[in-house]
Swiss-Prot record:
Cofactor: Mg(2+)
Enzyme category, top tier: hydrolase
Residue positions binding Mg(2+): 173, 193
Subunit structure: Monomer.
A GO CC annotation given for this chain: cytoplasm
Molecular functions (GO terms): GTP binding; GTPase activity; magnesium ion binding
Boundaries of every OBG-type G domain copy: 160-323
Binding site for GTP: 166-173, 191-195, 213-216, 280-283, 304-306
Protein name, UniProt field: GTPase Obg
Compartment list: Cytoplasm
Gene transcribed to yield this protein: obg
Amino acid sequence: MKFVDSARIVVKAGDGGNGCVSFRREKYVPKGGPDGGDGGRGGHVYLRANSQLATLLDFRYKKNYEALRGVHGQGSKKAGKTGKDIVINVPCGTLVKNSVSGEVICDLVEDGEEFLLARGGDGGRGNPHFTTSTRQAPRYAEPGGKGEELKVDLELKLMADVGLVGFPNAGKSTLISVLSAARPKIADYPFTTLVPNLGIVQYGEYKSFVMADIPGIIEGAAEGKGLGIQFLRHIERTKVLAVLVSGDGEDPVGEYRLLLGEMERFDPALLQKPRIIVVTKMDVVDEAFSLPDFEDDVPLIPVSSITRSGLEELRNALWNTINPSIP
């Protein structure tokens, strides 16, 4: 299934039904008076977070959503039925913005969470509402109100506990494939990963956490270079960042600092998240290799996805950072 993390849709709530102009017409009641019913309310448009969805792909094919209008009022004071509401399901982690103003409308995170996106128009009042002491037979009823209509942008931000961050070919996809059941495409060339991958990492017999592998960052990503900010937003919701640098690179410390710089330019709040430095590809480094000094107060774990060395230490460190109060 193709991964799509942005879409634009137009929603239209139902118009209200018109009020009715009607008068009693019964035998032996020559002046029956007004009896027009009220119109029904138009249908609302709701958004609902659904944990069974993982992409916004469906919205690339269906872009317009419209609820039903309310039914018009009838004689004998019969009110029109309310128009049927519609519920649009979106993946958990979907941010909704007004396409015109850019204003954030809602952020749907929890499964089943709902938001009223467009309100249906009120039903018009029938002619009995307009009687006065001097006007006993009004020939006027109120039209139904217009339902709200707006254009919105949907942005999906993945819901994961751990975000893997690194330059292309840092070993992110290989690492997530050995720690979880995820099977991303792996090859020895840059930008093998073109979309984010999610994997569930088991911890012990009954515990687990979710890890996200996003496409490799390059210098200038915050300004849109490479795959740019298209995927950087997917690490905004993570609880901890695993910053990967390749042990066989020429300047691991320089790579690390560049990665931090790109994240800070995109969103300074990313650097406030707990992070763990993961030095990968330890199976191919020279025997004389010694781990460089990165940051004194940030955990540093050397690993090899090939020999599996360091993986349990990394798994434990990630779990303890995500859940400091759960053994």
